[in-house]
Amino acid sequence: MEKTELIQKAKLAEQAERYDDMATCMKAVTEQGAELSNEERNLLSVAYKNVVGGRRSAWRVISSIEQKTDTSDKKLQLIKDYREKVESELRSICTTVLELLDKYLIANATNPESKVFYLKMKGDYFRYLAEVACGDDRKQTIENSQGAYQEAFDISKKEMQPTHPIRLGLALNFSVFYYEILNNPELACTLAKTAFDEAIAELDTLNEDSYKDSTLIMQLLRDNLTLWTSDSAGEECDAAEGAEN
């Protein structure tokens, strides 16, 4: 299928909320090997975010049920098997995205904005893997996620305005990584607060195109800070799942 047709089909699939189809189309576009435009890049990101998002929330629900089920309950094995099925789907999706990033997207990125976008994505998908991993596998996955986020973070600080939505989105997700994966509320709050404060200080640099995106992410940073600081004051831990980009 021609690239233009694949893009049209991906947009149609998005409107129909058939994200698996959308992801298949955008994977095919990526595998043609040319650098993606901003629009194509966003279509790819939205497709896989929705595809993996369904599995992540399903995994959380099933894991929660599993933890609350009595060990003597005959249903426990069935629940465990089902969780592992969802886990396997989640791993497969993440592996596919990480392969696309390493083989095509990061290698072909010619500007800092794209590079940061794809490295953030790499950090995100290793983070999703870390959510379901254990033992040495989890340790390695966490290192991979942190490495990608850190590389993206260093480039974004050097090359982008503090109000840039990609830089803000990266700070948001990197802080969620610190809070949820590394269990380090202090670092998570420092990172989120610094990103928020730096953006506030330069609000006049916001361009009209990205005003809505930037202010939305700033609101999410602030929401997480509120949640995390109240949580560390001794509130219910389970509720403190941070909003992410």
Curated annotation (Swiss-Prot):
Its main location: cytoplasm. InterPro entries: 14-3-3 (IPR000308), 14-3-3_CS (IPR023409), 14-3-3_dom_sf (IPR036815), 14-3-3_domain (IPR023410), 14-3-3_theta (IPR042584). GO terms for biological process: negative regulation of DNA-templated transcription; negative regulation of monoatomic ion transmembrane transport; protein localization; protein targeting; signal transduction; small GTPase-mediated signal transduction. Disulfide bonds: none annotated. GO terms for molecular function: 14-3-3 protein binding; identical protein binding; protein domain specific binding; transmembrane transporter binding. One of its GO terms (cellular component) is synapse. There is a cross-link at K49 (Glycyl lysine isopeptide (Lys-Gly) (interchain with G-Cter in SUMO2)). The modification N-acetylmethionine is found at M1. The modification 3'-nitrotyrosine is found at Y82, Y104. Transmembrane segments: none annotated. It is found in: Cytoplasm. Pfam families: 14-3-3. The keyword Phosphoprotein applies. The modification N6-acetyllysine is found at K3, K49, K68, K115. Homodimer. Interacts with CDK16. Interacts with RGS7 (phosphorylated form). Interacts with SSH1. Interacts with CDKN1B ('Thr-198' phosphorylated form); the interaction translocates CDKN1B to the cytoplasm. Interacts with GAB2. Interacts with the 'Ser-241' phosphorylated form of PDPK1. Interacts with the 'Thr-369' phosphorylated form of DAPK2. Interacts with PI4KB, TBC1D22A and TBC1D22B. Interacts with SLITRK1. Interacts with RIPOR2. Belongs to the 14-3-3 family. This is 14-3-3 protein theta. It comes from Rattus norvegicus. The gene is Ywhaq.
